[in-house]
A protein has these predicted regions:
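Negatively charged, low-complexity tracts enriched in Asp/Glu with abundant Ser/Thr
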Residues: 1-33
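Mixed-charge, Lys/Arg-enriched low-complexity segments
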Residues: 4-10, 61-96
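A general marker of short, structured functional hotspots
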Residues: 12, 18, 32, 37, ...
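A short, sequence-level motif marking secondary-structure junctions
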Residues: 17, 44-51, 69-73
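Generic serine detector
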Residues: 18-20, 53, 95
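Amphipathic, interaction-prone secondary-structure segments
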Residues: 24-57
């Protein structure tokens, strides 16, 4: 039996090149972990309820739920709006 090993993406391949890129990722149920100004965040679309959760990693009190990716882009990452920095964040993991 022959196996194919698929290499991991590079950071450049994982980054969001546009706001639409992030929206599409969330539309298809993507899961994202990213760093902005030294703080780790996560965004995921849950199947149950079909809502998007965004929060600081391991900080449940910062979790907010949104119905659309446009709404999720209004989440504040520190003092910045996610919409303004999504193409600049350091993506650590991206499922889609």
């Amino acid at each position: 039996m022959k196996y194919t090993i698929v290499p991991a993406n590079t950071p450049e391949q994982d980054r969001f090149v546009s706001i639409s890129d992030f929206k599409e990722c969330m539309h298809w149920g993507g899961e994202v972990e990213f760093i902005w100004k030294g703080t780790r965040y996560g965004a995921v679309r849950y199947v149950q309820g079909n809502r998007i959760s965004v929060c600081g990693a391991n900080r449940q009190e910062t979790e907010r739920f949104y119905d659309t990716a446009d709404e999720a882009l209004e989440y504040m990452v520190g003092e910045d709006r996610l919409r303004d920095v999504i193409t600049k964040v350091e993506v650590r993991f991206r499922s889609i």
